[in-house]
Amino acid sequence: MSDKIKPSEVSEVLLQQLQGISQSAKFDEVGTVLQVSDGVARIYGLRNAEANELLEFENGTMAIVMNLEEDNVGCVLLGSTSGIKEGQVVKRTHRIASIRVNDNMLGRVINPLGQAIDGMGDIDLKGAFEMPLDRKAPGVIFRQSVKEPLQTGLKAVDSMIPIGRGQRELIIGDRQTGKTAIAVDTIINQKSFYEAGKPVYCIYVAIGQKASTVAALVQNLKEHGALPYTIIVSATAADPAAMQYYAPFAGAAIGEYFRDRGYAALVVYDDLSKQAVAYREVSLILRRPSGREAYPGDVFYLHSRLLERAAKINEQQEVAEQMNDLPECMKGHVRGGGSLTALPIIETQAGDVSAYIPTNVISITDGQIYLESDLFNQGFRPAINVGISVSRVGGSAQIKSMKKVAGTLKIDQAQYRELEAFSKFSSDMDAVTAMTLDRGRKNNQLLIQPQYSPMPVGEQIAILYCGVHGLMRNVPIDKVRECQDAFLEKIRSAHPEIIETLASGKIDNDISNGIEAIMQDIAGTFA
């Protein structure tokens, strides 16, 4: 052979290849499945696992660490237990349970892991923020007092139990009393803010509901044009208990994504009674000690740490940027002045608000809207018992015109209920009592509102002005609602400036005289 192999060249090539070899070995920390049952697995060998860390099984199923014991780790599965057997290998991911969030989620239905479940394809998560499911609530220094109203579009709520941005207002009542209807109407009412370029992003969390119920709700939101600013997080009754337990945390994490970037967000938890039941199920299978009604001892902490994440963030940029427990991905993107409002829903049994979970959540929230089946059956809908419903934020979450007009409405209605109880025993009454009773009955009629028809705040103030000042005294009780519709039709078409002025928070003698003149004309046709 003419070409001789030169040893020096061979050694040079080998040397170059050896220098390019990476000496770092890749280690995976793994454990083995000891036991698996009812959506919970025990794993041996993961001695460095952290609480709330994601684990991966051989078949790709994910799990979250909940129990850290001396010789094993208890984790809850976020999928089916089929295909998981004793002795299988489980891998640490070194990631704390989180959800990837971006604006492409708006209008979609997702599960608590952030995966689309609405059959419309995967969500483009390019540039998404990794938001932790469980996160410490903002400290006092990073918060601001609640003073901006969150308009629900419901006369009874906006006038007597006002909700502010950053507040936590509980909706409580028996089944079939219209709890979800109040929350859905509130979401639909945010449409005008979205169209005006000042969106309130809404997150509806469905916990343990039927898939058909969630589908009907999505269809309703779509029909009323509320989907473009709404995200639905759903863990249906068919999903594992762990998914139902983590669904509200996923909703809160999505809400924080908007809140920390300076936007207003609203999250509805429907309902937390089912989350508590799911948590009880998981805890008992993990053999945690049980307490009252077999709930684990930390069920209060479960709801308090979830609801404390609702807040109005300080408007000062330099303060907001220093917020505690800020995710790494959010640094540099924080804007002050954002808010997260929470509307948790609790279902009571036979009106018993003194049960364990209802009293817990009542004590955590900033007020409650109490719905009664008796009122619902009598046709007063929304069936709000104004006597025991309260908002601890009060008038500071109302615009000035609403505060001025509806300031006495709650006391007036309380006085009416008291007199009504006495009037059943007495046939003769003085003129003042008769007038108070008449006005109270008519105000009750004015506060009735059909579902899916939230009312703009300017129109609410105009009609409530008529009720509070007794401008309908000559209208028969059965014609009050017709009179209201005719009045609103007239004021919308002929005097839109009155509605605009009231909505801006102003009310003066000219506006009052204008309302009185219109109602006088309309009431005359019904008298």
Outline where the language-model segments fall:
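Loop/turn-to-beta-strand initiation segments
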Residues: 199-201, 228-231, 262-266, 337-342
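P-loop NTPase nucleotide-binding/switch module
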Residues: 88-90, 97, 101-104, 117-168, ...
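Nucleotide-state-sensitive switch-loop elements of NTP-binding domains
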Residues: 200, 210-254, 284-296, 303-308, ...
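Walker A/P-loop NTP-binding active-site region of P-loop NTPases
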Residues: 164-217, 271
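Phosphate-binding/switch loop-helix module in NTP-utilizing enzymes
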Residues: 243-279, 331-332
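Phosphate-interacting basic helix/loop segments used at nucleotide- and nucleic-acid interfaces
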Residues: 13-24, 152-157, 251, 306, ...
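Acidic-enriched and Gly/Ser
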Residues: 2-17, 23-26, 32-150
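Conserved catalytic/coupling modules of large nucleotide/cofactor-utilizing molecular machines
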Residues: 274, 281-527
